[in-house]
Amino acid sequence: EANVLRLLPYLEEGWTAVNVQYRLGDVSLAPAAVEDSLCALRWVVRNAGQYGFDTDRLVVSGNSAGGHLALTTGMIPSEAGLDRQCLGDETPKVAAVVNWYGITDVNDLLHGVNQKSYAVRWLGAQPDMTEIAERVSPVNYVRSDLPPIISIHGDADPTVPYNHAIQLHRLLDRAEVTNELITVPNGRHGGFPANEMRRIYGSIFSFLNKNLPN
């Protein structure tokens, strides 16, 4: 419920928002959360008429783990097979992604200098954990037909390395995908000052207004 406050800037701009819950790592291992988010997107499309959603302007957004899920939801194609358990046969198309300091390369967090305990727990002791990590890593889905992507990341983030954002946006540039990376100087894993938040949301809405269909 605390995350509902993150929706307020969008509501103030006249957006309709859906707050998505997903299975956490202490309930279900990867790729359950990714599957849940893909199914939630399909639910939005299926219920668009009832709630007045504009399916031509669907934006997915999240912070931290939610940032990773926003990226995977907007980037993973149906042929990857991670939406097979979802109800319905809708083919949702995301119009833009807003990624707040999300993971972009899961394998990077499983081994070596960037190893993070939360990533190790999320993958668990599954025998195919490396393959699953590849399947849920946004950097592996970069291609030219992706929606516009904007990321916000602090360059002193101790939880998700800032290099994850740099790596993703370099790949997006090479694929000629519309994208923007907002760097928060000395920013850690969220908790940015009010003046930075005003700057960030101004940039987000400018990016969306410029790149979404009218």
What positions do the PLM features span?
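Short amphipathic alpha-helix adjacent to the substrate-entry channel of hydrolases
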Residues: 1-18
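Active-site-adjacent alpha-helix of alpha/beta-hydrolase-fold enzymes
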Residues: 11, 114-128, 156-180, 184
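Short beta-to-alpha linker loops that shape the active-site pocket of alpha/beta-hydrolase fold enzymes
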Residues: 16, 21-25, 103, 185-187
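Primarily recognizes the serine-hydrolase "nucleophile elbow" in alpha/beta-hydrolase
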Residues: 39-111
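Acidic catalytic loop of the alpha/beta-hydrolase fold
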Residues: 106, 156-160, 191
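Mobile cap/lid helix-loop segments that gate and shape the active-site cleft of serine hydrolases
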Residues: 108-141, 147
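Short beta-strand/loop motif that positions the catalytic acidic residue
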Residues: 145, 150-153, 157
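C-terminal catalytic histidine-bearing segment of alpha/beta-hydrolase fold enzymes
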Residues: 152, 162-214
